[in-house]
Amino acid sequence: MAKYPSEMFGYYWKDASKEAQSARKKHHCPFHDSECFKKSRLVDYPFGVCTAHTDGKEIALCPRRFLENGIVFKDIAKTHFGSIHNILVFSEVGLPGIGNFDFVMVKHKPLSTIVEDFVAIELQTGQTTSTGKLVEGFKDFMESGTLDPETTYNFGINTYDIWKRTFTQILNKGIILEKWRRKIFWVV
C-alpha cells in the first residue's frame, strides 16, 4: 500500500488553494497560528508534516493537528462540564516529579476566580520509524507541489512506542488524578 505525507502545514497535499500555498511558503501552522515548530536535520526549514497516509488511512503525526478550531476542547467541555461557558484552557501544566499535562481545562464560576472543576487533557499522535523516508516524501512535495498517491515512501508507524509511552503516562498521571478524583481525557 502507498505511504506518503498527506497533510503539510495544515493542508491536504491536493489542496492548491491560496491559503494552502501561503501556509507552505511561510511554513505556517494553521492549528496553532504560528510557524511550524517541527524540526528535522534533513531539511533546512520546518518539517511540516501533520498527517501521513499509510495502510489506507490517515495518521496524525503532530499533536498540534488536534487543535483545529478548538474542536477537541469544545467536545471535552461539553462532554465533561455540559457546557463550553466559563472554561479556561492552560497548556503544559507542570506536575513536579511526574511531568507536564499537555493541557488542563478549568471550569470556573461565572465572573469569578473560583474553580468548580477541572480535567487534564493529553494528546498522543503517531510516531514514525525510518522517518528519513517520510522527510524524503515531504521534500519531494515541497519541491514539486504535488505527490503521486501510488508512491510509497518506506516509513512505518511505531505503534509499540506510542502505546509504551502512553501507558507509562496513563499510570503515572492517572494515579495522581485518581487521588484528586478528577478525570483525564486522552486524545489519540
Label every PLM stretch briefly.
Residues 116-117, 181:
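A general structural motif
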Residues 1-100:
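Nuclease-adjacent, charged terminal/linker segments that flank catalytic cores
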Residues 50, 62, 89-91, 103-105, ...:
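Generic structural hydrophobic/aromatic packing signal, biased to beta-strands
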Residues 67, 108, 126, 178:
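Residue-level marker of positions within ordered structural domains that often coincide
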Residues 92, 98-107, 118-124:
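Short acidic loop-to-beta-strand element that houses the catalytic metal-binding Asp/Glu
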Residues 127-188:
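Acidic, metal/cofactor-coordinating or nucleic-acid-engaging core segments within structured domains
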